[in-house]
Regions:
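Hydrophobic anchor residue at the start of the ABC signature
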Residues: 53
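Helix N-cap at the start of a conserved alpha-helix in ABC-type nucleotide-binding domains
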Residues: 75-77
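Catalytic Walker B motif of ABC-type/P-loop ATPase nucleotide-binding domains
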Residues: 64-67
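Short coil-to-helix segment of the ABC ATPase nucleotide-binding domain corresponding to the Q-loop/switch region
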Residues: 4-11
Length: 137
């Protein structure tokens, strides 16, 4: 929400949850605490993406659906966002579904569904997921 600070952006969705996460702790884990009083237009695209992820995470969900979370980001920022998602999965125990056209990202998943024309054409379990830091495209 462009007219709210980063902290206010996250606070506004916290009210939708019976058991929200601590906002300051979440801001720290997202690397946004020092930017909490800035407006989204005052930070980078990657930080704006982290804010969007924070709005979803503050509700303490069991499932996070991310549609093209790296689509508009440069390579370095994309990898930072993917590493953040790994951290979210480990720290909060949140299952994450990533929808992407970037096939390289599939290497970090423990399960990959490939779709064609809206139908599942392949369902693969990945026995050895790769860390986001090791991905390259």
């Amino acid at each position: 929400v462009p007219d709210l600070t980063i902290k206010e952006n996250i606070e506004v969705t916290a009210h939708l949850s019976k058991n929200p996460l601590n906002i300051d702790d979440l801001l720290r884990s997202l690397g946004l605490y020092e930017h909490r009083n800035k407006f989204p237009r005052q930070v980078s695209g990657g930080q704006q993406q982290r804010c969007a992820i924070g709005r979803a995470l503050v509700k303490n969900p069991g499932l996070l659906l991310c549609d093209e979370p790296t689509g508009a980001l440069d390579y370095k920022t994309s990898k930072e966002i993917l590493q953040l998602m790994e951290d979210v999965n480990r720290t909060y125990g949140c299952t994450i579904i990533i929808v992407t056209h970037n096939a390289a990202i599939a290497r970090m998943a423990n399960r990959v569904l490939r779709l064609r024309d809206g139908r599942i054409v392949e369902d693969v379990l990945n026995e050895s997921p790769v860390a986001a830091a090791e991905l390259d495209w």
